[in-house]
């Protein structure tokens, strides 16, 4: 089973051994279509919608707030309507997939933890990457060379232990951290 979640943020448990935890809000979703163990679901995200979304809402008899669609693995879901959240109460471990924080175009020191050059004593080699190849052979830059470039905004999946799930407020508490900023949307699935 897969579920759509929004990251609330991080906190910690208040006991003898303080444990860092991540709080995730499980999004309410409506199952519109079931096919081969996969479900097309609609969920609420932002207020924006257009004529194409309006047509989908009319087709599946959805209210205006359900304006985004996603395909989830839903092997236990048998009928259309609200997505069944009963599986979350018994989960022990989940795989959480989120996009990392985007850092734009970053240099080699930030992106790859290069040491950099001397800061003073007449040096003019501070944050540069340095040499990127050999000599006449191979006469080109090797594939996979660590260089400056776009950093972050990549999909990252990690396994976390489930500490608790509050059905009323639909908040899932995971041990440890997950990628992304507070407020980021992602997915969780049972391991």
UniProtKB/Swiss-Prot annotation:
Coiled coil stretches, renumbered: none
Keyword check for DNA-binding: no
Keywords: Ribonucleoprotein, Ribosomal protein, RNA-binding, rRNA-binding
Gene Ontology cellular-component terms listed: cytosolic large ribosomal subunit
Residue segments, region Disordered: 119-138
Gene Ontology biological-process annotations: translation
Superkingdom: Bacteria
GO molecular function: rRNA binding; structural constituent of ribosome
Oligomeric and partner information: Part of the 50S ribosomal subunit. Forms a cluster with proteins L14 and L19.
Protein family: Belongs to the universal ribosomal protein uL3 family.
Record's function text: One of the primary rRNA binding proteins, it binds directly near the 3'-end of the 23S rRNA, where it nucleates assembly of the 50S subunit.
Protein name: Large ribosomal subunit protein uL3
Name of the gene encoding the protein in the UniProt record: rplC
């Amino acid at each position: 089973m897969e579920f759509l979640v929004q990251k609330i943020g991080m906190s910690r448990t208040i006991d003898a051994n303080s444990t860092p935890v991540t709080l995730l809000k499980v999004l309410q979703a409506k199952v519109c279509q079931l096919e081969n163990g996969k479900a097309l679901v609609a969920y609420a995200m932002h207020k924006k919608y257009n004529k194409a979304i309006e047509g989908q809402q009319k087709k599946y008899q959805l209210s205006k707030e359900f304006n985004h669609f996603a395909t989830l693995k839903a092997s236990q879901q048998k009928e259309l309507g609200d997505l069944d959240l009963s599986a979350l109460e018994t989960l022990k471990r989940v795989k959480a997939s989120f996009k990392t924080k985007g850092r734009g175009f970053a240099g080699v020191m930030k992106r790859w933890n290069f040491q950099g050059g001397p800061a003073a004593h007449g040096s003019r080699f501070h944050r540069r990457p340095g040499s990127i190849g050999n000599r006449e052979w191979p006469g080109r830059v090797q594939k996979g060379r660590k260089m400056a470039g776009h950093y972050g905004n990549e999909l990252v999946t990690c396994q976390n232990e489930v500490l608790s799930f509050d059905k009323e407020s639909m908040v899932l508490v995971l041990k440890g951290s997950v990628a992304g900023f507070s407020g980021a949307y992602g997915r969780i699935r049972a391991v």
